[in-house]
């Protein structure tokens, strides 16, 4: 699935008149393109408000990051659970009306989560970096910044807000982008979770080497439907290389009960990322315990 970035369409100024000529590819073709095109605009605005130099200065005073990958490898639960803090999504709308990030983070910790994932996209998921800041002040678990990262600036934003790991989505990034953004993330002490949706994307990531944490999203980018067998299909051709590179696999989306966790574990997933199914429950901590089969 080709995901296009927003085509350049600079404004032209003639005398006192300023205008832009409509681009023939000026409209996004799907929800992911729509998100990315809006993200381009958001990052530009953020850079004008807070220059990169200011973010770098703030990072100098921050404590060391926590070992996100190490926590997953050493988790006492199998599979390890990355519990997600998410208020809404483009496909489902508002998932949790009574959204209190602090309360949710504490419930997840008590429920046995190994790590947490925090949505920071504001326009489509009603999240924000301020949510990540709140969660960082509340719990000492390793935190993933769940964002549509397309520029290095966002990685600095994540680090300042308290992230220990960042998400890179293979479908929206070139190989060159993945390698450069990895370099930036590593320089800031951040773990990278690179997300793939199909076998070809996983092959790309394995060919690049040096990405020991890979998430397989069970959600179809075209239909937004989920199928746990996606994890099985994506992995089956690459099992040997996954083992050789010591890649830890995370199964993402469509996980609702302990049977689902057992299923993706049988496909090779050592961790799972779960959000919506937990966020809809009145008692999030109890729901997480039940998901993991705790009595």
UniProtKB/Swiss-Prot annotation:
It holds the Pfam family IGPS. It is an enzyme of class 4 (lyase). One of its GO terms (molecular function) is indole-3-glycerol-phosphate synthase activity. Keywords: Amino-acid biosynthesis, Aromatic amino acid biosynthesis, Decarboxylase, Lyase, Tryptophan biosynthesis. It catalyses: 1-(2-carboxyphenylamino)-1-deoxy-D-ribulose 5-phosphate + H(+) = (1S,2R)-1-C-(indol-3-yl)glycerol 3-phosphate + CO2 + H2O. SUPFAM superfamilies: Ribulose-phoshate binding barrel. The keyword Amino-acid biosynthesis applies. InterPro entries: Aldolase_TIM, Indole-3-glycerol_P_synth, Indole-3-glycerol_P_synth_dom, Indole-3-GlycerolPSynthase_CS, RibuloseP-bd_barrel. Its EC number is 4.1.1.48. Pathway: Amino-acid biosynthesis; L-tryptophan biosynthesis; L-tryptophan from chorismate: step 4/5. HAMAP family: IGPS_B. This is Indole-3-glycerol phosphate synthase. It comes from Prochlorococcus marinus (strain MIT 9211). The gene is trpC.
């Amino acid at each position: 699935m080709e995901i296009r970035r927003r085509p350049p369409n600079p404004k032209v100024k003639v005398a006192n008149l300023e205008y832009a000529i409509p681009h023939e590819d000026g409209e996004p073709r799907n929800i992911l393109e729509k998100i990315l095109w809006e993200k381009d605009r958001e990052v530009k605005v953020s850079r004008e408000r807070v220059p990169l130099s200011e973010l770098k200065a703030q990072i100098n005073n921050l404590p060391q990051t926590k070992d996100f990958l190490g926590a997953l490898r050493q988790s006492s639960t199998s599979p390890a659970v990355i519990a997600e803090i998410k208020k809404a999504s483009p496909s489902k709308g508002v998932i949790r009306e009574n959204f209190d990030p602090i309360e949710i983070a504490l419930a997840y910790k008590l429920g046995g989560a190994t790590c947490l994932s925090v949505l920071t996209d504001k326009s489509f998921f009603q999240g924000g970096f301020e949510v990540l800041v709140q969660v960082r002040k509340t719990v000492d678990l390793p935190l993933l910044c769940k964002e549509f990262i397309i520029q290095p600036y966002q990685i600095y934003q994540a680090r300042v807000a308290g992230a220990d790991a960042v998400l890179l989505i293979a479908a929206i990034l070139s190989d060159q982008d993945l390698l450069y953004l990895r370099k930036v993330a590593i320089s800031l002490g951040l773990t990278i979770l690179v997300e793939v949706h199909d076998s070809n994307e996983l092959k790309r990531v394995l060919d690049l080497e040096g990405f020991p944490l890979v998430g397989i999203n069970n959600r179809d980018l075209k239909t937004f439907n989920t199928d746990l067998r996606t994890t099985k299909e994506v992995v089956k051709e690459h099992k040997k290389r996954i083992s050789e590179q010591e890649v830890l696999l995370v199964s993402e989306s469509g996980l609702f009960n302990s049977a689902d966790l057992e299923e993706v574990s049988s496909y090779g997933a050592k961790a799972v990322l779960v959000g919506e199914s937990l966020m809809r429950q009145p008692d999030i901590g109890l729901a997480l315990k039940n998901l993991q089969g705790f009595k």
